[in-house]
A protein has these predicted regions:
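The feature captures the beta-strand-to-loop junction immediately N-terminal to the Walker
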Residues: 38-40
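Conserved ABC transporter NBD signature motif
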Residues: 61-69
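Conserved switch/coupling elements of ABC/ABC-like ATPase nucleotide-binding domains
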Residues: 212, 216-226
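Conserved ABC ATPase "signature" region
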Residues: 102, 117-135
Length: 259
């Protein structure tokens, strides 16, 4: 694996009001890595992800993308280096699915920004990857939540950044679609990396190479095997977990009625 850092933080502190989400975090993401950000509801996964993407200014420290401070990069530079998938998509007006996905090529267009045949081919390929090619002529306003989220992922694929940043990429997806999404992210080209906020610990165990786990005033980071340990999960979620071995995989089950 290339040891080059795509994304890194130096003494990063993130807060909302008086609540400190993380303090003096040193962390790095290398090409080929699939990081999942875990933590209970309201712990600050989305806020941290937005800070890492350059949308929010940190309370302290720096976020670096390819060694440069993310706050000093232009919007076009950022769009080519990192792409962000939000939890939900807010469509202000009607558009075909294909047109929405072609919009991912905007960072590479010049002049009037007319899309080329190559852009359309890339968009259709991305729709095929997320199993939405049959919907290319449909109106995005008429899609289900899960379908719209997969179209947004196709847009991100068409944008083709080095760093894929996703806020709950399996949200609104049925079981089969969750596997499609996670398999796709795991098999991105090796020069790319993924940072995804997730809720499903068992999907994380199956697909992530690394985990960043947020707790109250504490952060655990490292390989998936090292972070996903019952005692660490209990500390982060205030809930005990039972681990069931299933061949080479582990299944994590919260234990009801125990605190």
């Amino acid at each position: 694996m290339n040891a080059e850092k795509l994304l890194s933080t130096e003494q990063l502190s993130v807060s909302v009001g008086h609540k400190v989400l993380c303090s003096r975090l040193d962390w790095q993401v290398a090409p080929g890595q699939f990081w999942c950000v875990l933590g209970r509801n309201g712990i600050g996964k989305t806020t941290l992800l937005h800070t890492l993407a350059g949308l929010n200014r940190p309370a302290g420290g720096r976020v670096l993308i390819q060694g440069e401070d993310i706050q000093s990069a232009s919007a076009q530079q950022l769009a080519r280096l990192r792409g962000l998938l939000a939890q939900q998509q807010a469509d202000a007006f009607s558009s075909s699915v294909l047109a929405a996905v072609i919009a991912g090529r905007h960072p590479y267009q010049f002049g009037f920004g007319w899309d080329m045949e190559e852009d359309r081919a890339l968009a259709m390929r991305a729709l095929e990857q997320v199993r939405m090619a049959a919907f290319s002529a449909h109106d995005v306003m008429h899609l289900s939540g899960g379908e719209r989220q997969r179209v947004a992922l196709a847009t991100l694929l068409t944008q083709d950044p080095l760093l894929f940043m996703l806020d709950e990429p399996t949200a609104h997806q049925d079981a089969a679609a969750q596997i499609v999404v996670m398999e796709l992210l795991r098999h991105l080209p090796p020069q790319k990396a993924v940072v995804a906020a997730c809720h499903d610990i068992n999907l994380v165990e199956r697909y992530a190479s690394h985990v960043l786990l947020l707790g109250d005033g504490q952060v655990w980071q490292g390989s998936t095997d090292s972070v996903l340990q019952p005692e660490i999960l209990q500390a982060a979620f205030s809930c005990p977990f039972e681990v069931v071995e299933n061949g080479s995989r582990r299944l994590f089950m919260p234990i009801a009625g125990v605190s």
